[in-house]
């Protein structure tokens, strides 16, 4: 036991010494090298030992500048630094002559706004633009002497601009007038308006009296009833809208607008619904019915009604039956399709 303690003590001392040595070595390594340890110091030492002469000093001129234009550091007094000195002039660069700014005299006429100018030029631009450039260059030095001439010329141009603008407005009015009369012709509008009104009653009268009614029942399973709180959201999801005869109708438009395609009624008398009391309502089943002929494609309308009945039965766990309250099957489907074609 004592030998083990001795071994551990020796190992701990060795570890402490190693850590101290490593710390001193790291600190010494991070310190910057002195001038003696630098490589240039050794270079100068070797050069001195060989007896090589130091590089000759550079020659300086009378002003104290060497061949590279570098001179000795000079210390100036504060009074000297405050006195402004003229900038040095390079003799090799050409001195530009001082040009005094010339104030151009303003013309004694007012410029009209750009809105008074016409949209098109009265003269060809290829001939007018060079004359304007030469006229401006000639009149610039003698602007004061020709002020009256410029006033007359500007007045003539403004008058011509007003005349051109009036002509352009008259031409635009002549071009737009026939288009407006064609779009808003009272006689054509009065002739077409009664025709559109007369077409609607003809379409309604063409259906005539219903010759057949296609019926589908969605009934609850044996011993169960359909809850009104579940039926109402299903009706709204299937795009049915509460309306005439206190029942729900499926219209041409999903928003509840247009003609009625088919409807849903209560299977139990009196066959109506009360949307305000649907939570207290329960029934054995509901009836989908569609009259023939109907608006639009009868086959497409029946397909929508059949899919709606199946979707409702799946949502409320009910059963789809035909008009005789028999299970819906392929034979019944073919019979309904035959009745649709017969009344198309």
Swiss-Prot record:
- Tell me the organism: Shewanella oneidensis (strain ATCC 700550 / JCM 31522 / CIP 106686 / LMG 19005 / NCIMB 14063 / MR-1)
Pfam family membership, one: ZipA_C
Q: Which GO terms describe its cellular component?
A: cell division site; plasma membrane
> Highest lineage ranks of the organism?
Bacteria, Pseudomonadati, Pseudomonadota, Gammaproteobacteria, Alteromonadales
Q: Which gene encodes it?
A: zipA
BP-aspect Gene Ontology terms: division septum assembly; FtsZ-dependent cytokinesis
Report the membrane topology from the UniProt record.
Single-pass type I membrane protein
Which cellular compartments is it found in? Cell inner membrane
Domain of life, per the record?
Answer: Bacteria
Q: What is this protein called?
A: Cell division protein ZipA
